[in-house]
Amino acid sequence: SMAAHIATREASDADLQALRRFAMRNSISATKAELSEYSDANIKFHQMILELSGNELLRSTADGLLMHMHVVRRRAMGESDRASRSVADHMEIIEALESRDAELASRLVREHTMRLHDHIEDRWTRLNNLDESKQRVIGAAAEKIKIKEK
């Protein structure tokens, strides 16, 4: 969100037009279910905003995080409407950048990122609940076996 905030000041109109063209070109991948391609483009979109900020420290720090998140993002894109929601988010972010609204751009990036966080947290919670449920079923089955053996 800091990079988007800075990019509203630092990015040229031509830079923002290039970002929009990139996002539009890659939004097709999301709609055609070419999700691995879209996931890669999604990472590149965020890297482009980091580059537009002109802040090398932000860019290098975030690049490491983006690469760690790559696998998570790729998997999440295939679930529910994550890809189409991501495309819509990107367009809103671009509009905020183009209008040079630093606060809005920053907020939209933060909300976009937190939606992925919330999605992952929800999936993790459901997986943990599923594991607990499986353990209860296995425990109950083991008890039945013990009773039958007696």
Each model region followed by its residue ranges:
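C-terminal all-alpha effector/ligand-binding and dimerization domain
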Residues: 20-27, 32, 44, 67, ...
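Conserved positions within tetratricopeptide repeat
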Residues: 16-20, 39, 59, 106-107
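Amphipathic alpha-helical dimerization/coiled-coil segments
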Residues: 2-32, 37
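Hydrophobic, amphipathic alpha-helical faces that serve as interaction scaffolds
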Residues: 1-11, 41-80, 116-120
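Amphipathic alpha-helical packing segments from all-alpha helical-bundle domains
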Residues: 36-40, 60, 84-88
